[in-house]
Regions:
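Hydrophobic residues in well-ordered beta-strands that form the structural core
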Residues: 220-222
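Short acidic, glycine/proline-rich loop/turn micro-motifs
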Residues: 54, 232-236
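Secreted/periplasmic carbohydrate-active enzymes, especially glycoside hydrolases
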Residues: 1-201, 210-212, 216-217, 249-251
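Catalytic metal-binding/acid-base residues of hydrolase active sites
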Residues: 225
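Active-site neighborhood of glycoside hydrolase catalytic domains
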Residues: 215, 236-252
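Generic structural signal for helix capping and beta-alpha/helix-loop junctions
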Residues: 207, 228-230
Length: 252
């Protein structure tokens, strides 16, 4: 029995103060018998080196202030052999977390621990999350700092001016065989040049590129490599039929 997938979706409340983290894990059973009594325990930590003094961000306490648990538990329904079952969806509430933005790319570490019916740890995985709310809103002139009405990009309730570049995953010296060191150098050049936005030109990139943009604070515009060029090809383009929407989105 193993964790097949882990999806964590962060959000902020309407005041952009407190955070929530919606978590969904898929559990797969490769055994010969139905797996019963499994659960997933989630803990959220500040993104720093672990030590004995490092407490989870989410920590339930009793009326006297003593810690009673440091994780949220999601139950898993019985999984027949060869199949996958979604664990119970849970939402972690975090009081006034540090927010993620290009200027302050603060991140947290989510730990997911799969346990069996005897409470034995079977597998542990982790992922990085940042609390932020991204919105595109019609803004009247009296609410804009420059007195200009328009459709603006907001991060955590504040308008953001995107200063971006297109990026192809290629290098004149090594072609498409870009190293991680080269990627990190690119991000450093962007930050030094006050660039806060990058568009992956036409296709998804190496997962490490997404990791770096998340780590250093770059607003990343991802694309599905469909090459339909919006409405360039006219009515015959697959950009038009809504039936193809899910297929397009799945490519991102």
């Amino acid at each position: 029995v193993q964790i097949r997938d882990l999806v964590a979706t962060p959000d902020l409340d309407n005041n952009y103060t407190d955070g929530s983290l919606t978590i969904q894990a898929d559990i797969r059973n490769f055994g010969k018998k139905t797996a019963k009594g499994y659960k997933v325990c989630y803990s959220l930590y500040a993104n720093k080196l672990y030590s004995d003094e490092n407490e989870p961000v989410i920590l339930a306490r009793d009326t006297k202030g003593a810690a009673i648990r440091n994780s949220v538990v999601a139950q898993v329904e019985p999984i027949t052999t060869g199949n996958t079952q979604e664990a119970e969806k849970v939402v972690l509430k975090v009081k006034n977390p540090n927010k993620w933005s290009a200027e302050t790319p603060y991140r947290y570490t989510l730990i997911a621990e799969l346990k069996d019916h005897k409470n034995r740890s079977i597998e542990t995985v982790s992922t990085i999350v940042g609390f932020r709310k991204v919105e595109i809103k019609d803004t009247p002139a009296d609410q804009d700092e420059f007195g200009l009405a328009g459709r603006y990009y907001y991060v955590n309730g504040k308008t953001i001016k995107l200063k971006g570049v297109n990026r192809h995953e290629t290098n004149p010296a090594v072609g498409h065989a870009i190293t991680r060191e080269m990627m990190e150098k690119e991000v450093m050049l962007m930050k030094q040049g006050n660039i806060n936005h990058v568009r992956n030109s036409h296709y998804t990139d190496d997962p490490y590129w997404y990791y770096l943009c998340n780590k250093y604070g770059i607003y990343l515009e991802d694309e599905a490599n469909i090459e339909s060029h919006e409405y360039y090809y006219g009515a015959a383009s697959l950009s038009h039929p809504v039936e193809w929407k899910n297929a397009h989105v799945a490519r991102v």
